[in-house]
Swiss-Prot record:
Entry similarity comment: Belongs to the YbaB/EbfC family.
Protein name per the record: Nucleoid-associated protein Amet_4780
InterPro entries on file: YbaB-like_sf, YbaB/EbfC
Molecular function terms, GO-annotated: DNA binding
Native organism: Alkaliphilus metalliredigens (strain QYMF)
Ranges of compositional bias, category Basic and acidic residues: 25-42
Lineage: Bacteria, Bacillati, Bacillota, Clostridia, Peptostreptococcales
Keyword DNA-binding in record: yes
Chief place of localization: cytoplasm
Coiled coil: none
Amino acid sequence: MAKKGFPGMGGAPNMNNMMKQVQKMQKDMEKTQAALEEKEVEASAGGGAITVKVSGKKEVISIEIKPEVVDPEDVEMLQDLIMAAVNEAMRGAEEMVSKEMGKVTGGMNIPGLF
């Protein structure tokens, strides 16, 4: 009588365990993603002149600009500061998401997951 399951996989009981592990990982990932949606990353540029908050969903939540940095004669500097703060906050959010999801996936990089 032939063994059930895939060749080299040790039969059906091991496949059942693998499926349970995958289902547990999926649930853990969903919980982690929900928790990440509630977290925020903050970054600033220009010595705190511009402050940006980004969510765990990698969406900009807020941008704060100190009035003293608003110079109609130098809009380009303000644009550069905003861009720097947004990019830094996005990098921070990406690192936070990768770290938290890495705990769930055991460090496996699953494309398109987060």
